[in-house]
């Protein structure tokens, strides 16, 4: 039986992970859960899965949760120390890192240092601190299993192959809700429009990132570290049907691809059970029902955020961390109606222009760059 800690259990990835656990009680046991402020859902999860430890955002929320739960209660923690306690819980074999944004960096690093294998759904961990994190993975002899559908597809397409035989990695992207919208209308799209993803059901932040294609940019940077592949050998193709989740092209001209209906339970389950596979309840793919599979090159005029991600990766050092933090601030500002949709990429670019890249040697260096970028981005947007 595999014992799990789930960081971010009330989010989209966390709830899907627990659906898999519930479907296979003979294979999985939940040791620890963490959440932000969704106490009602966390309470339900605690009652069903009976973790030994839980953690929430603040001390006040921890007190509220304690009042909501009946005996026997788990240990209740809060804040960064609580996340670290969950990530390093002794019994856990695998830590599912599903916290959104840079907040997932510290607990994920703690899990790796504690010798835990990590099912990584938090792409910002490698975006902001890729070199540091991969060094930690090697030093501690643990495995990092990708949960993102695209990286899971690449991982599966690389199975049994030698890295020297890979010509390039091709990440696919749906193009989001604005793929065919006239460019002059992009500045006027609403939050509701941007949250209406055509294929995937996800949290708000990643859905906006998909609309700008920053999500794909983050995945390019993540792929650079996960698969030790330079940016010039990582391509992006827009594939509106989201059936082919990514591809690997080999030097002999052959291309290996992973296909399936858009459902995150499939890559989550593979990360949890590798190298085995288990039933997930995912709808079977019926190729005869498809009218066709189409592919397009990304248009940087429509999706400038993707170009910014490639630029950040080329600049290296602290720039990806700065870009990521600026994006988080800009997306939050858009969701709150403070800036327009096209203002997201503009704000990120201005923050990057104001930054001089420098070496990141420690997690603390990453967090310092992250903080600088958040403050600068808020200043440029006019939020501070």
Swiss-Prot record:
Pfam families: DXP_redisom_C (PF08436), DXP_reductoisom (PF02670), DXPR_C (PF13288). The keyword Membrane does not apply. Belongs to the DXR family. InterPro entries: DXP_reductoisomerase, DXP_reductoisomerase_C, DXP_reductoisomerase_N, DXPR_C, DXPR_C_sf, NAD(P)-bd_dom_sf. It comes from the Bacteria. Keywords: Isoprene biosynthesis, Manganese, Metal-binding, NADP, Oxidoreductase. Catalyzes the NADPH-dependent rearrangement and reduction of 1-deoxy-D-xylulose-5-phosphate (DXP) to 2-C-methyl-D-erythritol 4-phosphate (MEP). This is 1-deoxy-D-xylulose 5-phosphate reductoisomerase. One of its GO terms (biological process) is isopentenyl diphosphate biosynthetic process, methylerythritol 4-phosphate pathway involved in terpenoid biosynthetic process. Mn(2+) binds at residues 148, 150, 219. NCBIfam families: Dxr, PRK12464.1. Pathway: Isoprenoid biosynthesis; isopentenyl diphosphate biosynthesis via DXP pathway; isopentenyl diphosphate from 1-deoxy-D-xylulose 5-phosphate: step 1/6. Its EC number is 1.1.1.267. 1-deoxy-D-xylulose 5-phosphate binds at residues 123, 149-150, 174, 197, 210, 215-216, 219. SUPFAM superfamilies: 1-deoxy-D-xylulose-5-phosphate reductoisomerase, C-terminal domain, Glyceraldehyde-3-phosphate dehydrogenase-like, C-terminal domain, NAD(P)-binding Rossmann-fold domains. NADPH binds at residues 10-13, 36, 38, 122, 124, 203. It catalyses: 2-C-methyl-D-erythritol 4-phosphate + NADP(+) = 1-deoxy-D-xylulose 5-phosphate + NADPH + H(+).
């Amino acid at each position: 039986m595999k014992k799990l800690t789930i960081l971010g259990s009330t989010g989209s990835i966390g709830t899907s992970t627990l659906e898999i656990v519930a479907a296979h009680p003979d294979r999985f046991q939940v040791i620890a859960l963490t959440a932000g402020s969704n106490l009602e859902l966390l309470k339900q999860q605690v009652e069903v899965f009976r973790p030994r430890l839980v953690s929430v955002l603040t001390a006040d929320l921890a007190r509220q949760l304690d009042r909501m739960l009946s005996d026997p209660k788990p240990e209740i923690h809060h804040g960064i120390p609580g996340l670290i306690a969950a990530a390093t819980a002794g019994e856990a074999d695998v830590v599912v890192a599903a916290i959104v944004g840079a907040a997932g960096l510290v607990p994920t690093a703690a899990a790796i240092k504690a010798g835990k294998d990590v099912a990584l759904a938090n792409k910002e961990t490698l975006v902001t601190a890729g070199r540091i994190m991969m060094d930690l993975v090697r030093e501690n002899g643990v495995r990092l299993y990708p949960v993102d559908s695209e990286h899971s597809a690449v991982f599966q397409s690389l199975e049994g192959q030698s890295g020297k035989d890979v010509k390039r990695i091709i990440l696919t992207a749906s193009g989001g809700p604005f793929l065919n919208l006239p460019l002059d209308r992009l500045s006027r799209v609403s939050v509701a429009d941007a949250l209406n993803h055509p294929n995937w059901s996800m949290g708000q932040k990643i859905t906006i990132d998909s609309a700008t294609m920053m999500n794909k940019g983050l995945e390019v940077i993540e792929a650079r570290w996960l698969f030790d592949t330079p940016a010039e050998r990582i391509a992006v193709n827009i594939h509106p049907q989201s059936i082919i989740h990514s591809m690997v092209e080999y030097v002999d001209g052959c291309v290996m691809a992973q296909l399936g209906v858009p459902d995150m339970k499939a890559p989550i389950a593979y990360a949890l059970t590798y190298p085995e596979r288990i039933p997930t309840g995912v709808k079977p793919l019926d190729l005869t029902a498809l009218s066709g599979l189409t592919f397009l090159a990304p248009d940087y005029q429509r999706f400038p955020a993707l170009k910014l991600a490639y630029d950040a990766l080329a600049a290296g050092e602290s720039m990806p961390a700065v870009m990521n933090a600026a994006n988080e601030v800009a997306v939050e500002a858009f969701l709150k109606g403070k800036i327009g949709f096209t203002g997201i990429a503009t704000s990120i670019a201005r923050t990057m222009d104001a930054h001089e890249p420098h070496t990141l040697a420690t997690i603390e260096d990453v967090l310092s760059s992250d903080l600088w970028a958040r403050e600068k981005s808020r200043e440029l947007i006019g939020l501070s």
